[in-house]
Amino acid sequence: MGMLKRVKKASSAKKLKRLMNWYGPYLGAGVRLDYIADDWREVRVVMNMRWYNRNAVGTHFGGSLYSMIDPHYMLMLMKLLGSDYVVWDKAASIDFIKPGTGKLTAIMKVSDQMLGDIIQATSAGNKYLPEYPVKIFDESGEVVAKALKTLYIRKKPGITS
């Protein structure tokens, strides 16, 4: 069974957390889902410094920082909006503020306002391309990177409110 089917079948946040923590790219990057809210509205991801995710200058690989935040808004919104919606990651940018070392953390949340904006923007079948900022923090709470995630969201044809 493919990863997408497994994600869709994950009936609880606990099961999705377990699945994602055994996902090969996450294992290889040293990324771990630390917390997923039971209502799918918050995810906390951590990455500890390891020999296998350290670059030539002794800091975290930039790609590993991005992989920490990559699928989470998409996955949360897939669960929150249900099968009536198409949700894809469309684009992203990341700004590296300072070298990341030690344990890094990113928290992503979906608010009532975000869900309301999605439902309103897609009610007539239009695509919606929201942008969600994400910060990655070090152990002292300093921002090491800022990312901007753009999603593609559309209500599936033939679905009425």
Give the predicted meaning of each segment.
Residues 76-113:
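Hydrophobic beta-strand-centered segment that forms part of the acyl-chain substrate-binding groove
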Residues 32, 93-95, 107-109, 135, ...:
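Residues located in well-ordered beta-strands
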Residues 2-10, 100-101, 111-161:
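HotDog/MaoC-like acyl-thioester-processing domains
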Residues 52-72:
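Hot-dog-fold acyl-thioester-processing enzymes
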Residues 29, 41-43, 88-92, 102-106, ...:
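A generic structural signal for short beta-strands and their flanking turns/coil linkers
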Residues 29-33, 90-96, 117-119:
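Short structured motifs
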Residues 1-44:
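Non-catalytic linker/capping segments at the edges of enzyme domains
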Residues 49:
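Short, charge-patterned binding micro-sites
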